[in-house]
């Protein structure tokens, strides 16, 4: 099958709901007699032996994540936990009807499965590493046992532009904070404040645009009120 056929698999795979897609990946490997492992976080590693003549080449890890951001239009009845995506293909473009596409990072998983399934490519030994819950904090990667991997060269397939390779990587940090809170009953008029209508955007690729952030604005608003 081609790359497009692999991508069109109708399996719900939102963050926190990756068991079904993870099990499909395991079944994919078993049907092709490929070595495979799956951990408690639903991370999957699929291994393909080197092509003839490439047995001594270093193992290459291909890595991507299988969860997606689940957003839909206001009038959509799509259930991300039960329904597959309604894909529309126009020429070279694939879109989803009324929902996010999941191209981040479904395209990486599709590429990896196409590579694993191909008998025409001449390649070194491949380890396809598919992690989970990337969109909500890299949770699958954090739970991964690195000893499962033999390769020392990793190609992350979760970038923004084709044809561009970035050497090294970006990192992340999670901070756990305990703030002392004293609650007291306050009498008087209550008011609900909503901040909406902002442009939104990607916190990584568009952070330099200095767009308004509702969390920051809410914090500033409360800070100013506290000083009144």
Predicted region positions:
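Flexible, glycine/charged-enriched surface loops at secondary-structure junctions
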Residues: 38-39, 125, 225-228
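A non-catalytic alpha/beta surface segment that caps or lines the substrate-entry region
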Residues: 14-58
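Short, small-residue-biased leader/transition segments that mark boundaries at the very start
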Residues: 2-7
